[in-house]
């Protein structure tokens, strides 16, 4: 694993047996931004057969089009923004017709039997009709929250690519329509302060997901990563 926002690290990680480069941008949970075009150019320049796969869940296709930036394959958790209502579990793989046919006929479908049920498909199609207006509001809300937290005396650091001092701000501005609806932040006082904050909220739901109709918050160290050691969390 390498930090795909670091092009030198990506370059050094490429090996003769590399068959794919997988990146997520914006990345979960630190909102790091990878330059999709630059990563794709590096990978394809090293070996034209390397597949560049981009997880576009945090951006959605409304905000970012990785295929147009050089990626070969795009994956989405359709559970999130694409559906938008927190009531399905689904995923999308987007690519060339040739690649998708290989996946459907000779790949994952044959090995796992992974087929979306009709009602999930209906709900996602319904959600896609409002993706544009939902993403516009998600972005506006996230920016407002990020700017509020940025100036708050109890907040140590805010991770949001829409902030001008975010290290990936310029790349995000170039390859995204807007900066997304997700942000992370650190509060002063460490883990105990983070847990106290999450437990004190009333209008925000404590849950592990995103892209829902409600505002959600999670504290990874005590939730999704609660079994990790302090060294692993660091």
Residue ranges and their predicted role:
Residues 155-234:
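Conserved C-terminal alpha-helix-loop-beta "cap" of PLP-dependent enzymes
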Residues 1-154, 159:
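Conserved PLP-enzyme active-site core in the AAT-like
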